Regions:
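Contiguous transmembrane helix-bundle modules in multi-pass membrane proteins
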Residues: 129, 145-156, 166-183, 191-193, ...
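Transmembrane-helix signature of polytopic, membrane-embedded enzymes
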Residues: 115-134, 172-175
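Transmembrane signal-anchor helices characteristic of membrane glycosylation enzymes that use polyprenol
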Residues: 10-46, 231-245, 370-374, 446-451, ...
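Extracytoplasmic/lumenal acceptor-recognition loop(s) of multi-pass membrane glycoenzymes
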Residues: 54, 59, 65-69, 76-79, ...
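Hydrophobic alpha-helical transmembrane segments
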Residues: 82, 97-111, 337-352, 407-416, ...
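Active-site-proximal, structured, solvent-exposed surfaces of multi-pass membrane proteins
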Residues: 347, 653, 662, 702-835
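Polar, glycine-rich mid-to-C-terminal structural blocks
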Residues: 223-283
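Membrane-interface coil-to-helix junctions
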Residues: 18-114, 130-153, 267-341, 374-384, ...
Length: 835
């Protein structure tokens, strides 16, 4: 009963969070409809082979051959036995609520836990949770299907709560919270978001250090730091399998450093990613106003003609053109929506800079500024280059605009610290009233100026790319269209400027009513909560709304087979590849649903495969399209050995070609080398550049090109004859069996992608795999008949799983200790009360 009485308000807040989350998704959640996410729908094919194999065998394969010729599945819905227990704990944490509903619920609950750790009263903590959770970006990523990112962001505030508790001297609670939520965080599997929030934690720890130095409590600071480190290590240990294999995989992907020495070395970073690639999605400098004015740059990249209110100003003669132009006019290539943290929240943040005292304020301000400067990316390259070159791991992540998640955390937190100061010390509104006016002027004042004189502060409402595109129109149309388009977009902009102005004015009025004692503090908090919730709810409904939800059957329906798919699937050969030339080959996974594709889509494909795409595969695709078209599909008239040798070595047995009317046709490639073949010779080279160049200079059917470091494994081959045969007799994605017959022996090249962790046996005896032709596996066998098996069951899985289970044991022990300490504490309190 005492427990219920103590935590009743907290329980009511949690129930309110669940209700708010349900209501946002009504009526879709009541109808059982689900979000049609393009990313999820397009990704069906990516993991289809993995899912089928698991259904048929009960085994989880760590390799699939369905995309990019073959790649690990570590970043395709990663699943490890040790994570099953953690997954059940996670489900309990979000109260087994349905999808989408629980995403918003854990946003709310996580920030609430953190604010309670900061010693906020329940009502203020609930308000703070609303303004953080309803930040627009968090709903935009739900709509886009970036669910791992959703989870990662939701678990970071409660993880920080553990850090806060530890530095407040509550070591055991801090340890448990840090351990549990760092485990949740790592399992969420979005390293980029976790990495960005480490900057927040770093600044906060510096603030705690400054406070400890001031108070002479360095020993306490050291103890708290140790507690946080131990908690983080426990959380990491529970996810060691995922972490280790993600790290290992990362070394081999586009996020790892390339062995190629490129001519344009200045554009390269230590991670191997190009600077242009990393900064492609950079927030515009003037786009930063979206933090306070959501449509400062028009919102999302949707057709302008969809905005009915804006189109009231459109010239009817140009409506067709506006179907082609986006509502967004910023300098990003495109966007699903802006980063909006709330207009009145921005005012409270500015006010917090004046009235909140202590090092934590400066830590939050520094993190906010850092976040904004880094989000500018290519628009502020000196600063960006410094981080790319000197800050560990920063160059491994693209879409730098997403680092604004830091500002989306720090702005609401400092805003809530300001409101807490006002609630705890009401007299501050009288003593520091000039700061309230200043904060109002710096926020509502700018909104008013922008609304009245938009052209003075923002001269361009048409992007550079749009201006260039419009130059293709007849000269007499360009000026009227530009003028009308500018008027339309000014209307979009000024509408939201007025909107933000009124929201800040209403919020400020609530503060003034509290100052004049015409409104109690709880009523003021409730009023601000309603104001901010309505404000941000309405903005979020622009990007995540009911019409985006469909019947579950519509999304979960298996991908329909085309006639082309049916024809290719009649081929009963165990393993071959398909190249879809009728699609955006390297930006789709539909082909992978039924076939082993040369193409695919994954943000972290193997680096060497990408380099082969750039150097050989893409050029061969163009030549293939041209040659097959000129031959009218008659492959006997195509010189396949010289036109597409790399596609042949990848055992590309079928090309899918486009026809008129959106139809396709399969064309069989008679030049494909098959699953494996003996070569006459191995040419050894000294580096990656020589290796990738050498692939284009030899007859790959007879000669293999290998780095000299594989000379010990592969040695040399011998000239072969027609009696040398390699035949695949069993196929599993993670286990391939071949029957080999050869009177001479030598080097066998497999049309399979080389990756560390694959092992080979010949007649059940282990042999070392080598890498040839830049991306393929190879072994050397002796003369005779042999059974060769290639297998992918990395030993590292067993080792990391064992460590994870040890971590579980430590966590359970800590929980038992925590319960014991709490019981002992209550007994002492009860005994003291009796005395």
């Amino acid at each position: 009963m005492k427990f219920l009485k103590k935590y009743l308000l907290d329980i009511l807040v949690v129930i309110a969070f669940a209700i708010i989350s349900f209501v946002y998704f009504m009526p879709a959640d009541m109808d059982g409809r689900i979000l049609f996410r393009h990313d999820a729908a397009a990704g069906k094919g990516l993991g289809h082979e993995k899912e089928l194999f698991q259904q048929q065998t009960g085994e989880t394969t760590r390799w699939t051959n369905s995309v990019f010729g073959g790649m690990p599945t570590y970043q395709m819905s990663p699943s490890y036995e040790s994570n099953q227990v953690l997954s059940q704990i996670v489900k309990a944490y979000h109260l087994w609520l349905p999808d989408y509903v629980w995403y918003v619920f854990v946003y709310l609950l996580g920030f609430y836990i953190m604010l309670r750790a900061f010693n906020f009263r329940q009502s203020l903590a609930a308000l703070g949770s609303i303004i953080w959770a309803f930040s627009s970006y968090f709903f935009i990523i739900i709509a886009a299907g970036h669910i791992w990112k959703v989870w990662a962001l939701a678990y970071l505030p409660p993880m920080i709560a553990g850090v806060v508790l530890a530095y407040r001297g509550k070591y055991l609670k801090g340890l448990l919270l840090t351990a549990i939520f760092s485990a949740f965080e790592v399992q969420a599997n979005h390293v980029q978001m976790t990495y960005y929030y480490l900057f927040i934690i770093l600044f906060m720890v510096i603030a705690f250090l400054a406070d400890a130095i001031k108070k002479g409590e360095l020993a306490r600071f050291g103890k708290a730091t140790a507690v946080c480190v131990v908690g983080a290590l426990i959380g990491i240990s529970l996810n060691l399998s995922n972490l280790y294999h993600t790290w290992q995989y990362g070394q081999e992907t586009m996020r790892g450093k390339s062995e190629l020495v490129k001519k344009n070395a200045a554009n390269q970073t230590s991670s191997g990613l190009d600077r242009d690639y990393i900064t492609q999605w950079s927030y515009g400098i003037d786009e930063t106003w979206t933090l306070m004015i959501p449509d400062a740059k028009g919102g999302a990249s949707v057709p302008l003609a969809q905005n009915q209110q804006a189109m009231e100003k459109a010239d009817p003669n140009f409506v067709q053109i506006y179907q082609q132009l986006g509502q967004y006019w910023g300098n990003q290539p495109g966007t699903s929506g802006p980063v909006y943290v709330g207009a009145f929240v921005c005012m409270l943040f500015i006010l917090g800079l004046f009235i909140v005292k202590g090092p934590m304020k400066w830590a939050l301000l520094a993190a906010t500024i850092l976040s904004i400067l880094l989000a500018w990316g290519r628009n502020f390259m000196p600063f960006t280059n410094f981080f790319l070159d000197y800050v560990p791991m920063y160059a491994k992540f693209r879409t730098v605009a997403s680092i604004l998640v830091i500002a989306e955390f720090t702005i609401p937190l400092l805003a809530m610290m300001a409101l807490k100061k006002i609630v705890d010390e009401p007299e501050i509104l009288t003593e520091k009233i000039k700061y309230v006016y200043a904060s109002f002027g710096l926020t509502a004042g700018f909104c008013l100026l922008f609304a009245i004189m938009p052209g003075v502060f923002f001269p361009d409402f048409v992007s550079v790319q749009e201006t260039l595109a419009l130059q293709q129109l007849p000269q007499e149309y360009i000026s009227p269209i530009m003028s009308n388009l500018t008027d339309i977009r000014k209307g979009i902009f000024t509408s939201d400027c007025w909107r933000s102005f009124w929201i800040i004015l209403i919020g400020s009025a609530l503060l003034m009513l509290f100052k004049m004692k015409k409104l109690g503090k709880e009523y003021m908090i409730a009023g601000i909560a309603v104001l901010c919730l309505v404000d941000m709810w309405m903005v979020n409904k622009r990007y995540l709304y009911d019409d985006m939800f469909v019947d579950k059957a519509q999304r979960d329906t298996p991908q329909q087979m085309t006639e082309t798919d049916k024809i290719i699937c009649r081929d009963k050969e165990l393993d071959y590849r398909v190249l879809n030339l009728a699609s955006n080959t390297f930006n789709e996974n539909e082909t992978s649903y039924y076939h082993k594709s040369i193409g695919g889509y994954h943000p972290a494909k193997l680096r060497r495969y990408q380099e082969m795409i750039d150097a050989h595969i893409a050029p061969e695709m163009q030549k293939t399209m041209k040659a097959v078209a000129e031959a009218g599909g008659d492959m006997t008239k195509v010189n396949g050995d010289s036109i597409f040798p790399v596609l042949n070595m990848l055992n590309t047995k079928y090309f899918i070609l486009p026809l008129q009317g959106g139809q396709t046709v399969p064309v069989q490639n008679p030049y494909a080398y098959g699953n494996a073949w003996f070569v006459d010779e191995v040419q050894y080279v000294n580096n990656a550049n020589e290796e990738i160049d050498g692939v284009g200079k030899v007859n790959l059917r007879h000669v293999a090109v290998a780095d000299a470091k594989f000379k010990e494994q592969l040695a040399q081959s011998v000239k072969q004859d027609d009696t040398s045969v390699v035949k695949m007799i069993q196929y599993k994605p993670n286990n391939l069996t071949y029957e080999v017959k050869s009177s001479k022996g030598g080097v066998i090249v497999f049309s399979e992608i080389y990756y560390p962790g694959w092992t080979a046996t010949v007649d059940d005896q282990p042999v070392e795999l080598g890498r040839v032709d830049y991306i393929l596996r190879a072994i050397n066998v002796k003369p005779g008949n042999h059974k060769v098996v290639l297998d992918f069951h990395p030993q590292s899985l067993k080792n990391t799983e064992m460590v994870a289970y040890i971590g579980y044991g430590v966590l359970v022990l800590l929980i038992i200790i925590g319960i014991g300490v709490e019981i002992k504490k209550r007994k002492k309190t009860a005994e003291a009360a009796k005395e």
